């Protein structure tokens, strides 16, 4: 499931992040890439040890966790502290699949990466290129969203970032271990949840709505890891 989540970050949060990142000490993104990805990764990344890395990551994480669409679609068990990257001057990231396990230096845990999320920090007009391309069983999807919006997709997806030929592309990225590891099951639960919310707006707590809600929770109970 690939999902556009609008308005994750508000204007003040975006301004704070952009101002802090403008003075950041970036490093070569290849330093954090795996054996396959290092050959195709040409970007800059904020080191985990940077002074503002954790507070900025926590700001993005809190914004996602308060967004109902993220909660419904990701069903988060553990959200890794968000990181930050920068593309400019031809920077790009070729086709790759994210590593199955990632460690969080701040939380002191390693998690299974079920869901990948990118939060865009500047507007599409600020740069040329830089599209996130996600390939799945339904085809090839090109993503370039307004500042503050996020895209959520399965971490199993083959994906890339096209070359940035003008300007600078800033983004935050993160992984989530979901309570439901299978993407198809997460997608079904998400659609059922959205249907229940729509029906509740029309029928309030009619018996049919209560019954569907019960089915949702019984499926979640059956499929959830914990």
From Swiss-Prot:
The keyword Transcription regulation does not apply. It comes from the Bacteria. Fe cation binds at residues 96, 98, 159. Its EC number is 1.14.11.-. Pfam families: 2OG-FeII_Oxy_3, PKHD_C. Residues 78-178 form the Fe2OG dioxygenase domain. GO terms for biological process: DNA damage response; intracellular iron ion homeostasis. 2-oxoglutarate binds at residue 169. Transmembrane segments: none annotated. It is an enzyme of class 1 (oxidoreductase). Keywords: Dioxygenase, Iron, Metal-binding, Oxidoreductase, Vitamin C. Its cofactor is Fe(2+); L-ascorbate. The keyword Metal-binding applies. Binds 1 Fe(2+) ion per subunit. GO terms for molecular function: 2-oxoglutarate-dependent dioxygenase activity; iron ion binding; L-ascorbic acid binding. NCBIfam families: PRK05467.1-3 (NF003974), PRK05467.1-4 (NF003975). This is PKHD-type hydroxylase HNE_2117.
């Amino acid at each position: 499931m690939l999902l556009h989540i609008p308005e994750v970050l508000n204007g003040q949060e975006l301004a704070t992040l952009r101002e802090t990142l403008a003075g950041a000490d970036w490093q070569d993104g290849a330093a954090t890439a795996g054996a396959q990805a290092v050959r195709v990764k040409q970007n800059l990344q904020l080191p985990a040890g940077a002074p503002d890395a954790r507070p900025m990551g926590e700001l993005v994480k809190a914004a996602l966790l308060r967004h109902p669409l993220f909660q419904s679609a990701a069903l988060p068990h553990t959200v890794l502290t968000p990181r930050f990257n920068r593309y400019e001057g031809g920077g790009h990231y070729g086709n790759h699949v994210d590593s199955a396990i990632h460690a969080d230096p701040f939380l002191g845990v390693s998690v299974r990466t079920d869901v990948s999320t990118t939060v865009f920090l500047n507007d599409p007009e600020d740069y040329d290129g830089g599209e996130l391309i996600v390939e799945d069983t339904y085809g090839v999807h090109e993503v370039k969203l307004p500042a503050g919006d996020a895209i959520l997709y399965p971490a199993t997806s083959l994906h890339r970032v096209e070359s940035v030929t003008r300007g600078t592309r800033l983004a935050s990225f993160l992984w989530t271990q979901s309570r439901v590891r299978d993407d198809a099951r997460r997608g079904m639960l998400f659609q059922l949840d959205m249907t229940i919310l729509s029906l509740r707006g029309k029928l309030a707590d009619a018996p049919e709505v209560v019954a569907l809600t019960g089915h949702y929770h019984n499926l979640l109970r059956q499929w959830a890891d914990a």
